[in-house]
Amino acid sequence: MPLRELITYVPCRECSFFHIFQNVKQRFKHYDLTQSLMSPTYFNITDAKGFLESFSCIYRDRPMIVWIDTPFLVDNGCDMKKAKVYTTSEYVKEMIKNITHVDGVLRPPYNLVAEQERTAGVEKEYLFAVVGAEPKGGKIVRKRIEYTLNLLREMGLRNRTKVVSNVGDYNVSVFTLHVKDYYRLLHRAYFYLSLSKSEGFGMPLMEAMSVGVPAVYVNAYSYKEFAVGIPIDPYDIIVEEAGSWRMENYLIKDNDVREAIKEARECAIRKSCYEDLSAKALEKSKMFGQYDIEERVISELKGIMRNYKP
């Protein structure tokens, strides 16, 4: 029996939204999800800033599901009264609450490859995995990749770190790894290291946790909601501007980062310490299984279409 088709608006291919789309598509058994790059449709997985500022006023009375994530502040838009609006985190929900209503938080799922990978007997090959791309043009620095690499180099740990990025002296270019190789790369690290200024959700950190890899992370924004590992508390927050983009920047002290990195290094050589953190990370990641996502999406769509009166 052929699958029914559900056109899904995802505005890009080499981006985190496409990864979410692929992971969601794995969990659909009765519908075939087909990506639309061009315009919004009944099911949308997209950036909150781009979508709300460009489309929310046009589609404010259209029935649809809008599942959004962003690290950037949203400046304007309209309440999408007929839509079901979900965010990837409480952090994003709070950011857009004055623009549109939000029906709830819907966490992105990991790729099902993780469930095979987490049971594989893998030797740890490096202390840290770092994953992050910066927008082309160099005007926005959000992931702090080069800052991270400079600090690791200063501490003599650059050669014990695998970096997937598009800036700095990375080891692997972003969006080039097959999904199995990507999860294996994460699994081979003791810790996932992320020092981002802000994150709407943070797919790589969640993906690392899904194979039992804890994190060294900034204890703020979305990470504060689910990350397991060694936190770095920010000491202040500012709003940073880059052209038409604005984002919150959670400031961290170099010395606090160094101390967290040292703590991770020490934990990695203490079996009880590491196994405890790894088990907690893996257990926490189960909240991202999302096995009922098809039933939930289809039920929501049927409900809003049933109640729609043009």
What name fits each language-model region?
Residues 1-55, 290-291:
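N-terminal pre-catalytic "stem/leader" segment of glycosyltransferase-like enzymes
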Residues 75-77, 81-102:
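A short, active-site helix/loop in glycosyltransferases that binds the activated sugar's phosphate group
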Residues 91-92, 99, 105-116, 167-169, ...:
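Short beta-strand->alpha-helix junction loop in the catalytic core
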Residues 112-170:
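Conserved catalytic-core segment of nucleotide-activated headgroup transferases in glycan assembly
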Residues 184-200, 213:
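Acidic donor-binding loop of glycosyltransferase active sites
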Residues 214-217, 224:
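Short hydrophobic beta-strand element within catalytic cores of glycosyltransferases
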Residues 251-259, 268-302:
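A charged, aromatic-enriched C-terminal amphipathic alpha-helix characteristic of glycosyltransferases
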